[in-house]
From Swiss-Prot:
Protein name: 3-hydroxyanthranilate 3,4-dioxygenase 2
Chief localization: cytoplasm
Family (UniProt): Belongs to the 3-HAO family.
Protein's gene: bna1-2
Pfam families reported in the protein's UniProt record: 3-HAO
Lineage: Eukaryota, Fungi, Dikarya, Ascomycota, Pezizomycotina
């Protein structure tokens, strides 16, 4: 059992873990939940050129400790929506909601996730940002059991960046930018 501690002191002593390229530190990993401290800015350019979203079957809880963040989601598989989470606010993201956290410089947040059940599958989706689609259009989807998001995402993203044909939208033919 972890004894109570000052979160502000922890942040002051571990601030280097909350900047690119790491940005993320697992503060607690128990039987049922994982609690991560996340800093900004994001080091990838997902939000602007390529719409990449993670789909987790379980809920995620966001609490914005310092500064504001933006959570880009796909709502009901029909609409892109941006949710602003301001400093001091919290938000519970329902399971199976495609999302992309956009973190800005000098921000700190907490994210709590349930441990994934053994039969749970996460999805990494890339959406077309070039065509004039009536609803969010998936270009590519990778499905995997998430054991360690930090190590599992990198090869999937690198494959996307290298393989131009995998970035071609089946609906409009546009090729998405690699980053």
């Amino acid at each position: 059992m972890i004894p109570p501690f000052s979160f502000a002191s922890w942040v002051a002593e571990n601030e280097d873990k909350l900047h690119p390229p790491v940005n993320n530190y697992c503060l607690y990993s128990g039987e049922d939940f994982t609690l991560m401290v996340v800093g900004g800015p994001n080091s990838r350019n997902d939000y602007h050129g390529v719409f990449i979203m993670v789909v987790n079957q379980t809920e995620e809880w966001f609490y914005q400790v310092k500064g504001d963040m933006l959570l880009r989601i796909v709502e009901n598989n029909t609409t892109f929506r941006d949710i602003s989470i301001k400093e001091g606010e919290m938000f519970l993201l329902p399971g199976n909601t495609p999302h992309n956290p956009v973190r800005f410089r000098d921000t700190i947040g907490l994210v709590m996730e349930r441990k994934r059940p053994e039969d749970s599958l996460d999805r990494l989706r890339w959406y077309c940002s070039k065509g004039k689609h009536k609803k969010p259009t998936i270009i590519r989807e990778e499905i995997f059991h998430c054991a360690d998001l930090g190590t599992q995402l990198k090869p999937l993203i690198e494959r996307w960046q290298i393989d131009e044909e995998s970035r071609r939208c089946g609906a409009c033919g546009a090729i998405a930018d690699p980053k």
